[in-house]
Amino acid sequence: MVTAKKAAISSFYAVDRSEILGGGRFGQVHRCEEKATGLKLAAKIIKTRTAKEKDEVKNEINIMNQLDHVNLIQLYDAFESKNDCILVMEYVDGGELFDRIIDESYRLTELDVIQFTRQICEGVRHMHQMYILHLDLKPENILCVNRDAKQIKIIDFGLARRYKPREKLKVNFGTPEFLAPEIVNYDFVSFPTDMWSVGVITYMLLSGLSPFLGDNDTETLNNILACRWDLEEEEFQGLSDEGREFVTKLLTKEKNWRISASEALKHPWLADPRLHCRLRTQKQQRPAGARDPTDK
């Protein structure tokens, strides 16, 4: 169990402040090294000038302490000072999954997307079994372990919440294009809220497109509330029926009708080895959605 030490991080770790690994609303992540062992780690430096900000970091530490899964980033140590808190976490160097979506030279096959989606669902299932909602799932919050392997870890539990069935939880934060309809409506959130985001991520991995993104936030939120999306774009040509059904079962406006992480992992798209074998041999691993020149 990690608790925030009121000691100087420099006594234990060398933090390379010149190298920024990532950042967000919280601050920045730097590469660091444990002085005693030489172990490479990542230091997330969070500005905490108010009691509320400090409590938010303590919540993040508390949540990360409860999670132990190969597809979730692990907390290693924590430090607290007057103006900031520093979380020391395991280091991975494969970059954001988002980078692979937008990289024109990196074409994902449907089988690649299945591999990524399965791991996302496995990480989410573990969180949900521990009664934790992530509430900020998006490609920027999924890191690849290295440049070559298709292994991922979910990061950033800064907005995560413990789910207590008797306490009806409402939230009003997140990134517009990944918000579930119940967040937009300021309605109660629960496990299906994360599964909507998994649906958006899967859609993006398959196509490079964002299903609800409008010209501005208002249009994006209206698209979400109307549940206005389809798989008719050229990028989805060649997508298996199982893949289409999988996305459809997640991007469902009524949250009680969405499949859970456990159900997603049993869905044929993620679980049927015969389908995976067919996709492996089919059309020499064409990118998901790419048109086969032999197709009439």
Residue ranges and their predicted role:
Residues 45-68:
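Conserved N-lobe beta3->alphaC-helix segment of eukaryotic protein kinase catalytic domains
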